[in-house]
Amino acid sequence: MAQDAQNLIWIDLEMTGLDPQNDAIIEIATIVTDGQLNVLAEGPVLAIHQPESVLDRMDDWNRKQHGESGLTERVRRSTIGEAEAEHLTLGFVSEWVPPNESPICGNSICQDRRFLARCMPRLEAYFHYRNLDVSTLKILVERWAPALKEGLQKQSTHRALDDIRESIAELRYYRDTVLKI
């Protein structure tokens, strides 16, 4: 594996809620693709330990979702904190992409970036300032070509690695059907 500035870093976080100032990251995963969206490597998938007091603040949706997926229990058992998760993830992405080259890639990625800025600032700073947000295309298709949305199937497990795989597949779908490039 060699660093390539054309590679893309895909990231997804699972959090205890949507408020970057008060909620916490509980899972992080990364995938690196080439510029044509071919997966080159999957990074570590890490459940991040949070104290019970943090987990207790989850709203009903998050409590149900992360409880049913098993993530809440993985978080309780995890010995990995945010700093170690940041270090391990940086170690992975730095093998594939030089600093400040890849946009941060994913779905609704601005939300993840806000959490990274507070909880994992070195990782957030590793990305280019631009975002490759698949949600932008999703919103445009919903408004301008809603019939095209029917061809897209998503599982929506709300597990970080699954969500990244679905984001990459979704962008491929938009490239092939909407952008036709």
Swiss-Prot record:
Residues 8-171 form the Exonuclease domain. The active site is at Y129. The keyword DNA damage does not apply. It is found in: Cytoplasm. GO terms for cellular component: cytoplasm. Disulfide bonds: none annotated. Its main location: cytoplasm. Keywords: Cytoplasm, Exonuclease, Hydrolase, Nuclease. Its EC number is 3.1.15.-. InterPro entries: Exonuclease_RNaseT/DNA_pol3, Oligoribonuclease, RNaseH-like_sf, RNaseH_sf. One of its GO terms (biological process) is DNA metabolic process. One of its GO terms (molecular function) is nucleic acid binding. Belongs to the oligoribonuclease family. 3'-to-5' exoribonuclease specific for small oligoribonucleotides. This is Oligoribonuclease. It comes from Methylococcus capsulatus (strain ATCC 33009 / NCIMB 11132 / Bath).
